[in-house]
């Protein structure tokens, strides 16, 4: 299946959720309303693109004439998971942390992405990681100095630039308004959850 644009992935996820919640696909008007399109025609164009990519079948003559293809009926085909709030002490990729999936080709990123994390705050704005963006993350447990990491400090998950000197780790913000987070590994807990490998801009999902 060809990779989807962010908007196409969002519409496909909406269709799947609607079917799961109500037992039927949404109408074009419902898609337009929920995603802020000016008209149902805009939704129709996206549906046609999804059909061309083999994600759905369009059934003529009915307002709810949308059918998922077999490849999209399986949860495993949903694509990259978007991670929401992470509970204390639990793996970041635990199923209960997954808000939804986006059909984005992991190979778009180098190294390939394993999950997406929604950016909160502006501590990394100077390198273009902005509030509301989706950060593509490659799962990793080790990092080199200078890499941008997703780190868990005690029970808080944060995105920062990694620097280690002996037993001290500095997690640097890319915003002069924020001081580094300093972690003494002899007395505090820190784990690397992954490496930032790309950003999907917030506006692409609106």
UniProtKB/Swiss-Prot annotation:
Gene3D superfamilies noted in UniProt: Umud Fragment, subunit A, Winged helix-like DNA-binding domain superfamily/Winged helix DNA-binding domain
GO MF term list: DNA binding; serine-type endopeptidase activity
Reaction catalysis annotation: Hydrolysis of Ala-|-Gly bond in repressor LexA
UniProt keyword list: Autocatalytic cleavage, DNA damage, DNA repair, DNA replication, DNA-binding, Hydrolase, Repressor, SOS response, Transcription, Transcription regulation
Location of the DNA-binding region in this protein: 28-48
Enzyme class, spelled out: hydrolase
InterPro entries: LexA, LexA-like, LexA/Signal_pep-like_sf, LexA_DNA-bd_dom, LexA_repressor, Peptidase_S24_LexA, Peptidase_S24_S26A/B/C, WH-like_DNA-bd_sf
One Gene Ontology term from the biological process aspect of the record: SOS response
Pfam families reported in the protein's UniProt record: LexA_DNA_bind, Peptidase_S24
Family: Belongs to the peptidase S24 family.
Physiological role: Represses a number of genes involved in the response to DNA damage (SOS response), including recA and lexA. In the presence of single-stranded DNA, RecA interacts with LexA causing an autocatalytic cleavage which disrupts the DNA-binding part of LexA, leading to derepression of the SOS regulon and eventually DNA repair.
Subunit note: Homodimer.
Record's protein name: LexA repressor
Organism name: Shewanella sediminis (strain HAW-EB3)
Gene designation: lexA
């Amino acid at each position: 299946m060809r990779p989807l644009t962010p908007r196409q992935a969002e519409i496909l996820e909406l269709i799947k959720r609607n079917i799961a919640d109500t037992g039927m696909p949404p109408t074009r008007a419902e898609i337009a309303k929920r995603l802020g399109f000016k008209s149902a025609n805009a939704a129709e164009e996206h549906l046609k693109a999804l059909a061309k990519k083999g994600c759905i079948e369009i059934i003529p003559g009915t307002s709810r004439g949308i059918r998922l293809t077999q490849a999209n009926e399986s949860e495993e085909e949903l694509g990259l998971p978007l991670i929401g709030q992470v509970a204390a002490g639990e793996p970041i990729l635990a199923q209960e942390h997954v808000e939804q999936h986006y059909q984005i080709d992991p190979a778009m990123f180098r190294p390939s992405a394993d999950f997406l994390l929604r950016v909160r705050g502006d501590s990394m704005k100077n390198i273009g990681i902005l509030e509301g963006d989706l950060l593509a993350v490659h799962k990793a447990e080790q990092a080199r100095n200078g890499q941008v990491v997703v780190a868990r400090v005690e029970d808080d998950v944060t995105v920062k630039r990694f620097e280690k000197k002996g037993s001290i780790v500095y997690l640097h913000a890319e915003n002069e308004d924020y001081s580094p987070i300093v972690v003494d590994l002899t007395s505090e807990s820190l784990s690397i959850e992954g490496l930032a490998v790309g950003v999907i801009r917030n506006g692409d999902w609106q």
